[in-house]
Amino acid sequence: MRARALTVVLAILAALLLAGCPPRESISKINEDPGRYAGKEISIAGHVTDSFGALGHGVFLVDDGTGAMWVFSKNYGVPGTGASVAVVGRIQQTFAFGGRNFPTILLETQRRH
């Protein structure tokens, strides 16, 4: 009886935890129709292939094998090239940083894992 109750509690906790996670999308799907995702919180994952920044914020390019997307990090620093990351943020169309313009970018809203 106790084991069954523990199983039920763990299942409920797992469901609550997963319900709070934004959906993970492929970068190619986002790039095909960025307007569909504009302003929405999503998650992407992949490897960092480029990055630049200073004083704790900057941009980095994440490639998930289907495409690549720039991510702006204001509070969490910029990972090095080759790092494997999962990022949660909001899609924004048109963004400027460091003298460069980005047509679509993910604005990081949670610390990455």
State the predicted function of each range.
Residues L17-H113:
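OB-fold and OB-like single-stranded nucleic-acid-recognition modules
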Residues M1-C21:
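Sec-dependent bacterial lipoprotein signal peptides
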